Amino acid sequence: MPLHHLTRFPRLELIGAPTPLEYLPRLSDYLGREIYIKRDDVTPIAMGGNKLRKLEFLVADALREGADTLITAGAIQSNHVRQTAAVAAKLGLHCVALLENPIGTTAENYLTNGNRLLLDLFNTQIEMCDALTDPDAQLQTLATRIEAQGFRPYVIPVGGSSALGAMGYVESALEIAQQCAEVVGLSSVVVASGSAGTHAGLAVGLEHLMPDVELIGVTVSRSVAEQKPRVISLQQAIAGQLALTATADIHLWDDYFAPGYGVPNDAGMEAVKLLASLEGVLLDPVYTGKAMAGLIDGISQKRFNDDGPILFIHTGGAPALFAYHPHV
């Protein structure tokens, strides 16, 4: 078993059973390709999402260290911050969130609805900053201040994207391999690539479990030149902790995130509408809408290795739909 070292890491069970892997018949007919979806949007806490996989490992480590406070950072509409705050509430921990307004909007819906509304319901302590220019350093400064107030803080990086957090997506690769066995021979997997932990964890896991499968990361905030070193750095760190080699190339498409992180675009919103109308599946304007736009265009432009089945990783994010309506 190539990933047996995964069991060495403490893990807090937050998700339970594997998330569904489903065939999308109407989208498949529409695109002329077999399309499957991994439903990490339906994880069980606080409207779901992929970050719970990372939090299973990160919060287990926080509890092991005796922390009573989780500190993390992200955009006002961060799905990661929302899920971290929910887990903190569930466990009776304090949560401090350092937030930025990356799109500089004054739209009330963006500033108060969606994920931001949920943070208030989870009784999260909100700290605003002008910009997360150096989030690791900014989080450490905040942790020092919180510690001076008598708390025992544990810092969770942006997106939960550390080598430890990314173990959650090595675990996801195991689920995918087991769910696909004798059911479907995948050719490609498509995932949104942002803080890079989800992408890197899948890269390590799939390289060892499904080495013939092409993994495509659709960037949501950076060019390939900016994003690839981030994914590779985490890929190598994960592999090192699992005593594995990781030699698979990292494939990224950066044609679909303009005009920038957190700013909806036409192709992404069309993808949101398409999945909702054809399959009753809700994507979001920031991550999965843009990643699905990449999948759709990738088929049209023949960018995939072959014409075989494609799996789309649904990382969640639907609460942001309410924050982005009608526009920002």
Curated annotation (Swiss-Prot):
Q: Where are its TM segments located?
A: none
Q: Enumerate the InterPro entries for this protein.
A: ACCD_DCysDesulf (IPR027278), D-Cys_desShydrase (IPR005966), D_Cys_desulphydr_bac (IPR023702), TrpB-like_PALP (IPR001926), TrpB-like_PALP_sf (IPR036052)
For this UniProt record, the keywords arranged alphabetically read as follows: Lyase, Pyridoxal phosphate
Which residues are recorded as modified (N6-(pyridoxal phosphate)lysine)?
Answer: 51
What does the entry give for GO biological process?
Answer: D-amino acid metabolic process
Instruction: Please list the reactions this protein catalyses.
Output: D-cysteine + H2O = hydrogen sulfide + pyruvate + NH4(+) + H(+)
Top-rank taxon:
Bacteria
Listed cofactors: pyridoxal 5'-phosphate
Single annotated GO MF: D-cysteine desulfhydrase activity
Question: EC number(s) of the enzyme?
Answer: 4.4.1.15
Q: Does the keyword field hold Lyase?
A: yes
Q: Tell me the protein family, please.
A: Belongs to the ACC deaminase/D-cysteine desulfhydrase family.
Function, as annotated, reads: Catalyzes the alpha,beta-elimination reaction of D-cysteine and of several D-cysteine derivatives. It could be a defense mechanism against D-cysteine.
| Subunit and partners | Homodimer.
Q: What is this protein called?
A: D-cysteine desulfhydrase
Q: Which organism is it from?
A: Salmonella choleraesuis (strain SC-B67)
**Corresponding gene?**
dcyD
